Every structure is written in C-alpha cells, then in structure tokens.
Design a protein with these regions (language model features):
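Short gly/ser-rich anion-binding loops that grip negatively charged ligand groups
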Residues: 43, 69, 82
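Short, hydrophobic transmembrane alpha-helix segments
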Residues: 2-14, 31-38, 165-166
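Alpha-helical transmembrane segments of multi-pass inner-membrane proteins
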Residues: 1-2, 17-29, 47-65, 78-237
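Extended hydrophobic/aromatic-rich secondary-structure runs
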Residues: 33-48, 64
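Interfacial loop-to-helix junctions that mark the boundaries of transmembrane helices
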Residues: 7-16, 38-44, 73-76, 141
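Membrane-interfacial interhelical loops
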Residues: 6-7, 63-73
C-alpha cells in the first residue's frame, strides 16, 4: 500500500508479525490443552534454538543493541524479526506432523508463488509497471533480488514434488509451473540467484544419482546432462 513508509517492506512485515502473534495465542492455548501441539525435540529444532540463543547474545553485545533488536523500516529484520520467524518455526513444527499436512502447506506456498509469477509475467509483457524501473522484474516484492530468492526456494520445491509423484497430470502441472517460474527468475537478472540455482541443481543431481534408483535417478542424470549441455550449446553458438 502507498500509505505506508517503505510500502514493500513494512506492509508485509507488519501483516506477518501480527498474524504470527495471533497464531501464537491460539497455539499456546492448544499446546496447554492438547499434548500433540507441544514442540518436540529434534536435531533441526535444537540447531535453530542454539542459533537463536547465539543471535540473542550477539544482539545484546552489539554496538547498537537497540538497532540490532528493532532494525529499521528499510529492512524490518533485527532480532525482533528473528523471534517472529522462530515462533513461526515452532508453530509449524508443532502443528504439522504428517507428510500430507506438510504437502498441503507447501502446495499452498506454491499456489502463492504462481500468482506472484503471473504478476511478473504481466510486468514482462508491459501490462504492469516494474517498481524499480528498468527491466528487472520485481513483482509484488519491489526488489528483483528478493523475488529471485523467493522463486529459488519454490523451484526446488517443484523439483521435489515432480520427482516424488507418479501421476502424469501432476508432473505436467509441476513442470509447467517450473518453466513459468524459471522464466521469471531469468528476467529478474539476479546473477547470484541464477548461479546459485545452477549450482544447487548440480549438487541435487549428484546426490540423487548417488542415493536414488530407478526413475528418479534417470531424471537426475538427464538434469545433470542438461546443466552441462545447455550452457555449452550457448557458448558454441
């Protein structure tokens, strides 16, 4: 919204933090009433908790503890932002238990990424303005680098679901969304994200070739071949 200071940052952050705080009230109540909603120890949970403790100490001992905790309107990060993300992590980990529940969560996130990608597509077609000016797509983020990072996560989520499903129509849908988001990633012109995506593909392909068998392994080999041959073809042409 244009009425906010740094509208692409503050609006999303205030909305996220308010929603997390409301969810936290419901979650704490549910955790007291029903044991299944209480956090369970895991390697990831312990690692994240240690990280939060270290960041808390770093905040207190920083040059400006006030700014380290509250950050600024330009970024809206700081330790207060980490605390909300940590709370979100605890709520998700305590609420979603089964693979089906996690699948629904990630599919909801993918649906949102499709809407964001179509926004970028309309920018590419000249139907919507690019907020930064120039030609780098930024969609609803107002920043091409943020959009690229967002798409980076969802591209790998799409790869995961593509490899795990055996239904042709699902694979076709995942593949179509993957191509859409890959095009938008390219037109963000964010070199770091694009190189990171290529490096991630190589690493994922190597791991799948080593650890998987059957169809997944064949897809991994095909992907590795494409990563090598496509840049080579551009170079030769």
């Amino acid at each position: 919204t244009r009425s906010l200071y740094f509208p692409f940052i503050t609006g999303k952050n205030f909305t996220f933090r308010i929603l997390i705080e409301l969810l936290a009230i419901v979650w704490v109540y549910a955790a007291f009433r029903f044991p299944r909603f209480r956090p369970r120890a895991s390697a990831i949970a312990v690692a994240v908790t240690i990280f939060m403790a270290v960041m808390g100490i770093a905040t207190v001992l920083s040059i400006s503890p006030y700014k380290s905790f509250w950050s600024s309107f330009e970024r809206m990060e700081g330790y207060i932002g980490l605390l909300h993300l940590f709370l979100y992590f605890l709520i998700l980990g305590s609420t979603f238990r089964s693979p089906r529940e996690w699948s629904q969560f990630f599919h909801a996130s993918l649906a949102a990424s499709v809407l964001v990608s179509f926004y970028g597509l309309f920018q590419l077609a000249g139907k919507l303005a690019i907020h930064q000016g120039g030609t780098r797509l930024d969609a609803t983020f107002g920043n091409a680098t943020y959009l690229a990072t967002y798409l980076l996560f969802h591209l790998f989520i799409l790869i995961w679901f593509f490899l795990r499903t055996h239904q042709p129509w699902r694979r076709a849908a995942y593949g179509a969304v993957f191509l859409l988001e890959l095009v938008i990633l390219y037109y963000t012109a964010t070199r770091g994200a694009i190189l990171g995506f290529i490096g991630g593909l190589v690493m994922l392909g190597v791991l799948l070739v080593i650890l998987e068998r059957g169809t997944v392994r064949r897809w991994a080999l095909a992907g590795l071949g494409a990563v090598v041959l496509v840049p080579l073809a551009f170079f030769l042409v």
